[in-house]
Amino acid sequence: MNPNQKIITIGSISLGLVVFNVLLHVVSIIVTVLVLGRGGNNGICNETVVREYNETVRIEKVTQWHNTSVVEYVPYWNEGTYMNNTEAICDVKGFAPFSKDNGIRIGSRGHVFVIREPFVSCSPTECRTFFLTQGSLLNDKHSNGTVKDRSPFRTLMSVEVGQSPNVYQARFEAVAWSATACHDGKKWMTVGVTGPDSKAVAVVHYGGVPTDVVNSWAGDILRTQESSCTCIQGDCYWVMTDGPANRQAQYRIYKANQGKIVGQTDVSFNGGHIEECSCYPNDGKVECVCRDNWTGTNRPVLVISPDLSYRVGYLCAGLPSDTPRGEDAQFTGSCTSPMGNQGYGVKGFGFRQGTDVWMGRTISRTSRSGFEILRVRNGWTQTSKEQVRKQVVVDNLNWSGYSGSFTLPVELSGKDCLVPCFWVEMIRGKPEEKTIWTSSSSIVMCGVDYEVADWSWHDGAILPFDIDKM
């Protein structure tokens, strides 16, 4: 066979192989179309079966592919349904970490907002961290002077719980230097307070749209909770204060449905002071543990019924939970009166557990450092000092700050009771540290059926930043 014949032979064989390969592909495609196109194929080919087990819990999506089943659980919530939130608070033995955002550590090199007053609130499908920005980023010149509480640059924004308050994932909620937010099962409602001290306005948003307003009625820094409001069967409740921070002020409870205010009532509390309430649903009512910035080192308690009737007093426990405060041994509790004669204060929280109470407080008696939560037997109804449990969340070598409450709804947790949760703000920068800015990160804890060991989930950022050295 001469060279030309060899070339022709090899070429013919190659062409034959190519044609054979093409025919195999064509046959494969035809067989696949015929098999997948059949109806009633006994479930052995690609088929999706959707079974709704409970309209408020999940859809079970089963995909069967050549006798191999893949089960994917898809969270499902009927957005036309209100959350109930009339269940009791779960009885818990300790609190386990839920999330930590590490915002300041990340912000040394990332695009993270300068914030204060972070808080958490949950819908039937997710929890979000809300926070008040200063309209500036960490490690940037506009962070200078952000120790100031109220400015036209402050806004309420939110991210999924656990995310840092960063530029790329944050969602705008309202223009605000004081705020609250909650979900009724259908949409988010936010209340953002902004404007001048003497004529501040609270703008109610529902589903992201302004729906109502509350104007300052006392002309002295209208303000609200700085934590989650509370929705029960479609109605949402929150508490507002207008008046002095260091003497008698005025207090109101508001009730809204789909972002429209449908009721309000003044709280009569002569001699007592209410600010920055931390509220949660329990047994069909709203229970709030607040801040007395006037005299008391015990915390005001406000229990709100759906008809806006209320009971107001103080947390009975014989242990103080505000800061600054005196020695535990020298404190005598009261269910009706402020005790301790210490001005100023810090936002805090408590949870009723039957007649017991879980109460959070800074470890330091004089500064916002460290954080612990105590369970006091009969502390909701009596001046008891009996601690049955204590858990450290931030050690006393590290800064803390505000703290507040929220609950996991049964639609989210799958339990038949409301899981009690709390967050602790960890303030960094001015006035305690040598920076030009003030900001914070947070740790979030939720109740569990087990005791949890003490540890310190502190902020951990190394200061000062580059901007502070310029």
Curated annotation (Swiss-Prot):
Membrane topology: Single-pass type II membrane protein
The protein's name in its UniProt record: Neuraminidase
Protein's cellular compartments: Virion membrane; Host apical cell membrane
Keyword tags: Calcium, Disulfide bond, Glycoprotein, Glycosidase, Host cell membrane, Host membrane, Hydrolase, Membrane, Metal-binding, Signal-anchor, Transmembrane, Transmembrane helix, Virion
Xref: Pfam families: Neur
Residue intervals on the Intravirion side: 1-14
Species of origin: Influenza A virus (strain A/Duck/Hokkaido/8/1980 H3N8)
Annotated family: Belongs to the glycosyl hydrolase 34 family.
InterPro entries in the cross-refs: Glyco_hydro_34, Sialidase_sf
Domain notes: Intact N-terminus is essential for virion morphogenesis. Possesses two apical sorting signals, one in the ectodomain, which is likely to be a glycan, and the other in the transmembrane domain. The transmembrane domain also plays a role in lipid raft association.
Summary of activators and inhibitors of this protein: Inhibited by the neuraminidase inhibitors zanamivir (Relenza) and oseltamivir (Tamiflu). These drugs interfere with the release of progeny virus from infected cells and are effective against all influenza strains. Resistance to neuraminidase inhibitors is quite rare.
Binding site for Ca(2+): D292, G296, D322
HAMAP family attached to this UniProt entry: INFV_NRAM
Cellular compartments per GO CC: host cell plasma membrane; membrane; virion membrane
Lineage, top ranks: Viruses, Riboviria, Orthornavirae, Negarnaviricota, Polyploviricotina
Region (Head of neuraminidase): 89-470
